[in-house]
Amino acid sequence: MPLLDSFTVDHTRMNAPAVRVAKTMQTPKGDTITVFDLRFTAPNKDILSERGIHTLEHLYAGFMRAHLNGSAVEIIDISPMGCRTGFYMSLIGTPSEQQVAEAWLAAMQDVLKVENQNKIPELNEYQCGTAAMHSLDEAKEIANAIIAAGISVNKNDELALPESMLQELKID
Protein backbone atom coordinates (compact mmCIF):
# COMPACT_ATOMS: atom_id res chain seq x y z
CA MET A 1 0.00 0.00 0.00
CA PRO A 2 1.51 3.39 -0.94
CA LEU A 3 2.49 5.74 1.88
CA LEU A 4 0.22 8.79 1.91
CA ASP A 5 1.87 12.22 2.16
CA SER A 6 0.12 12.98 5.45
CA PHE A 7 1.98 10.11 7.11
CA THR A 8 5.47 11.28 6.11
CA VAL A 9 5.48 14.15 8.63
CA ASP A 10 6.24 13.88 12.34
CA HIS A 11 2.97 14.42 14.16
CA THR A 12 4.81 14.70 17.50
CA ARG A 13 6.43 17.96 16.33
CA MET A 14 3.41 19.68 14.79
CA ASN A 15 2.35 23.02 16.19
CA ALA A 16 -1.32 23.80 16.62
CA PRO A 17 -3.25 25.77 15.68
CA ALA A 18 -1.28 25.87 12.44
CA VAL A 19 -1.55 25.87 8.66
CA ARG A 20 0.53 23.47 6.55
CA VAL A 21 0.63 22.95 2.81
CA ALA A 22 0.07 19.20 2.79
CA LYS A 23 0.29 18.73 -0.97
CA THR A 24 0.21 20.52 -4.31
CA MET A 25 -0.58 18.94 -7.64
CA GLN A 26 -1.34 19.98 -11.18
CA THR A 27 -4.51 19.06 -13.04
CA PRO A 28 -4.22 17.85 -16.65
CA LYS A 29 -5.34 21.35 -17.73
CA GLY A 30 -2.61 23.03 -15.67
CA ASP A 31 -4.53 24.28 -12.63
CA THR A 32 -2.80 23.95 -9.29
CA ILE A 33 -4.65 22.13 -6.53
CA THR A 34 -3.35 22.80 -3.03
CA VAL A 35 -4.30 20.70 -0.02
CA PHE A 36 -3.92 22.39 3.36
CA ASP A 37 -3.65 20.73 6.76
CA LEU A 38 -5.53 23.05 9.12
CA ARG A 39 -4.39 21.68 12.46
CA PHE A 40 -6.66 22.84 15.28
CA THR A 41 -5.10 20.79 18.10
CA ALA A 42 -1.76 19.11 18.71
CA PRO A 43 -1.86 15.49 17.52
CA ASN A 44 -1.99 12.87 20.27
CA LYS A 45 -2.40 15.58 22.93
CA ASP A 46 -5.85 16.99 22.35
CA ILE A 47 -8.90 16.15 20.28
CA LEU A 48 -11.83 18.19 19.02
CA SER A 49 -15.15 17.17 20.52
CA GLU A 50 -17.38 15.07 18.30
CA ARG A 51 -20.30 17.52 18.36
CA GLY A 52 -18.06 20.57 18.11
CA ILE A 53 -16.13 19.37 15.05
CA HIS A 54 -19.37 18.28 13.38
CA THR A 55 -20.95 21.70 13.91
CA LEU A 56 -17.74 23.35 12.68
CA GLU A 57 -17.89 21.16 9.58
CA HIS A 58 -21.26 22.73 8.75
CA LEU A 59 -20.15 26.31 9.51
CA TYR A 60 -16.44 26.42 8.65
CA ALA A 61 -16.69 25.44 4.99
CA GLY A 62 -19.04 28.30 4.17
CA PHE A 63 -17.20 30.86 6.26
CA MET A 64 -13.81 29.93 4.77
CA ARG A 65 -15.23 30.26 1.26
CA ALA A 66 -16.56 33.72 2.12
CA HIS A 67 -13.09 34.84 3.26
CA LEU A 68 -10.75 33.00 0.88
CA ASN A 69 -12.48 32.39 -2.45
CA GLY A 70 -11.73 34.93 -5.16
CA SER A 71 -10.39 35.28 -8.67
CA ALA A 72 -7.28 33.17 -7.88
CA VAL A 73 -8.69 30.74 -5.28
CA GLU A 74 -11.66 28.40 -5.21
CA ILE A 75 -12.17 26.01 -2.32
CA ILE A 76 -13.14 22.52 -3.47
CA ASP A 77 -13.71 20.89 -0.07
CA ILE A 78 -13.08 21.25 3.65
CA SER A 79 -13.40 18.02 5.62
CA PRO A 80 -12.63 17.04 9.20
CA MET A 81 -9.71 14.71 9.84
CA GLY A 82 -10.59 11.28 11.15
CA CYS A 83 -8.25 11.88 14.11
CA ARG A 84 -10.35 14.94 15.02
CA THR A 85 -7.35 17.26 15.33
CA GLY A 86 -8.26 19.47 12.38
CA PHE A 87 -9.51 19.74 8.82
CA TYR A 88 -8.14 19.21 5.34
CA MET A 89 -8.94 21.92 2.81
CA SER A 90 -8.50 21.28 -0.93
CA LEU A 91 -8.62 24.22 -3.28
CA ILE A 92 -7.74 25.44 -6.73
CA GLY A 93 -5.00 28.04 -6.47
CA THR A 94 -1.98 28.76 -4.29
CA PRO A 95 -2.84 31.14 -1.46
CA SER A 96 -0.10 31.72 1.09
CA GLU A 97 -0.23 30.16 4.52
CA GLN A 98 -0.73 33.70 5.89
CA GLN A 99 -3.79 34.26 3.67
CA VAL A 100 -5.24 30.95 4.84
CA ALA A 101 -4.51 31.79 8.50
CA GLU A 102 -6.24 35.17 8.16
CA ALA A 103 -9.30 33.56 6.54
CA TRP A 104 -9.32 30.90 9.26
CA LEU A 105 -9.30 33.51 12.04
CA ALA A 106 -12.07 35.46 10.30
CA ALA A 107 -14.10 32.24 9.97
CA MET A 108 -13.68 31.58 13.69
CA GLN A 109 -15.01 35.09 14.40
CA ASP A 110 -17.99 34.22 12.20
CA VAL A 111 -18.63 31.06 14.23
CA LEU A 112 -18.87 33.20 17.37
CA LYS A 113 -21.57 35.33 15.70
CA VAL A 114 -23.92 32.39 15.04
CA GLU A 115 -26.85 33.10 17.33
CA ASN A 116 -28.28 29.66 17.97
CA GLN A 117 -28.40 26.05 16.82
CA ASN A 118 -31.23 26.85 14.37
CA LYS A 119 -28.78 28.99 12.36
CA ILE A 120 -26.45 26.07 11.56
CA PRO A 121 -26.69 25.39 7.80
CA GLU A 122 -28.04 22.01 6.67
CA LEU A 123 -28.78 20.88 10.23
CA ASN A 124 -31.70 18.63 9.40
CA GLU A 125 -32.19 14.92 8.77
CA TYR A 126 -32.45 15.44 5.00
CA GLN A 127 -29.06 17.12 4.57
CA CYS A 128 -27.03 15.77 7.50
CA GLY A 129 -26.21 12.16 8.28
CA THR A 130 -26.19 12.69 12.05
CA ALA A 131 -28.35 15.75 12.62
CA ALA A 132 -28.62 15.12 16.37
CA MET A 133 -24.83 15.26 16.85
CA HIS A 134 -24.22 19.02 17.00
CA SER A 135 -23.21 21.59 19.58
CA LEU A 136 -22.91 25.26 18.74
CA ASP A 137 -21.50 25.87 22.23
CA GLU A 138 -18.69 23.36 21.64
CA ALA A 139 -17.99 24.84 18.19
CA LYS A 140 -17.74 28.28 19.80
CA GLU A 141 -15.35 26.91 22.45
CA ILE A 142 -13.12 25.62 19.64
CA ALA A 143 -13.34 28.97 17.81
CA ASN A 144 -12.43 30.90 20.97
CA ALA A 145 -9.43 28.62 21.56
CA ILE A 146 -8.14 29.20 18.01
CA ILE A 147 -8.55 32.97 18.28
CA ALA A 148 -6.84 33.07 21.69
CA ALA A 149 -3.90 30.92 20.55
CA GLY A 150 -3.34 32.46 17.12
CA ILE A 151 -2.35 30.45 14.07
CA SER A 152 1.22 29.50 13.15
CA VAL A 153 2.68 27.72 10.13
CA ASN A 154 3.95 24.13 10.02
CA LYS A 155 6.57 23.50 7.32
CA ASN A 156 6.99 20.07 5.73
CA ASP A 157 10.79 20.26 5.64
CA GLU A 158 10.83 20.85 9.42
CA LEU A 159 8.43 17.96 10.08
CA ALA A 160 9.65 15.36 7.57
CA LEU A 161 10.27 11.93 9.03
CA PRO A 162 13.67 10.52 7.99
CA GLU A 163 13.50 7.78 5.36
CA SER A 164 15.15 5.35 7.78
CA MET A 165 12.35 5.93 10.30
CA LEU A 166 9.67 5.53 7.62
CA GLN A 167 11.22 2.16 6.72
CA GLU A 168 11.35 1.17 10.39
CA LEU A 169 7.68 2.09 10.93
CA LYS A 170 6.50 0.40 7.73
CA ILE A 171 4.03 -2.44 8.07
CA ASP A 172 4.35 -5.08 5.35
Swiss-Prot record:
EC class name: lyase
Catalysed reactions listed for this entry: S-(5-deoxy-D-ribos-5-yl)-L-homocysteine = (S)-4,5-dihydroxypentane-2,3-dione + L-homocysteine
Cofactor dependence: Fe cation
Keywords: Autoinducer synthesis, Iron, Lyase, Metal-binding, Quorum sensing
Gene Ontology molecular-function annotations: iron ion binding; S-ribosylhomocysteine lyase activity
Binding site for Fe cation: H54, H58, C128
Biological-process GO terms, alphabetical: quorum sensing
Any matching Pfam family: LuxS
UniProt keyword annotation of Aminoacyl-tRNA synthetase present: no
Cofactor binding summary note: Binds 1 Fe cation per subunit.
Quaternary assembly: Homodimer.
Family according to the record: Belongs to the LuxS family.
Family annotation (NCBIfam families): PRK02260.1-2
Name used for this protein in its record: S-ribosylhomocysteine lyase
Organism: Vibrio atlanticus (strain LGP32) (Vibrio splendidus (strain Mel32))
